[in-house]
A protein has these predicted regions:
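Short, Lys/Arg-enriched N-terminal segments with co-localized hydrophobic residues
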Residues: 1-9
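Solvent-exposed alpha-helices and their adjacent loops that cap or buttress functional pockets
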Residues: 7, 63-66, 85, 105-107, ...
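Glycine-rich phosphate/diphosphate-binding loop of Rossmann-like nucleotide-binding domains
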Residues: 10, 14-33
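C-terminal binding/interaction regions
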Residues: 13-15, 19-20, 98-159
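A short beta-strand-loop structural module common to alpha/beta enzyme folds
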Residues: 37-48
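Helix-adjacent hinge/juxtasegments
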Residues: 54, 58-94
Length: 159
């Protein structure tokens, strides 16, 4: 696969809850082996914790520009992505397959991907990460649609 969107100088944030410590650690090592700088916003213990805290942390890190992109992992990917999506400017998408990850970047300009440590295995997770990092936002008609999504956020965020 061509590295259409990959920028190895990119700083990537990663967050997780207790259910995803092992997967997070493997993804961190994988990203480092590819030459990325990785910032850990997740827990490093198996003690039960609350995924919304970590979704907010990764959302804020991406929205502020502290990191360029984020990866969020909990049991299913759903809860942590919901929390991240509450942060202005975040477009977090749960991905359980590489195709969805690629389309999330190419068509939706997803700045955070999420997946479930209890849903997919580590090799699938690595493939998802690769597809997402290699993809590039296509712009054009997709940019207009992303703008529409962001307009929804602006209209409804302060209800």
């Amino acid at each position: 696969m061509k590295n259409k969107g990959r920028n190895k100088d990119m700083k990537i944030g990663i967050a997780n809850d207790h259910s995803a410590v092992d997967m997070k650690n493997e993804i961190v090592e994988y990203l480092k082996s590819l030459g990325y700088e990785v910032v850990n916003y997740g827990t490093d213990t198996y003690e039960s914790c609350n995924y919304p805290e970590y979704g907010e942390k990764i959302g804020n890190a991406v929205a502020s520009g502290e990191v360029e992109l984020g990866i969020a992992i909990c049991g299913t990917g759903a809860g942590i992505s919901l929390a991240a999506n509450k942060v202005n400017g975040i477009r977090a998408v749960v991905c359980s397959d590489p195709y969805t990850a690629r389309m999330a970047k190419e068509h939706n300009d997803a700045n955070i991907i999420a997946f479930g440590a209890r849903v997919i295995g580590i090799e699938t997770a690595k493939c998802i990460v690769d597809e997402w990092l290699n993809a590039k936002f296509e712009g054009g008609r997709h940019a207009a649609r992303v703008d529409m999504i962001m307009d929804v956020e602006k209209r409804n965020h302060n209800l």
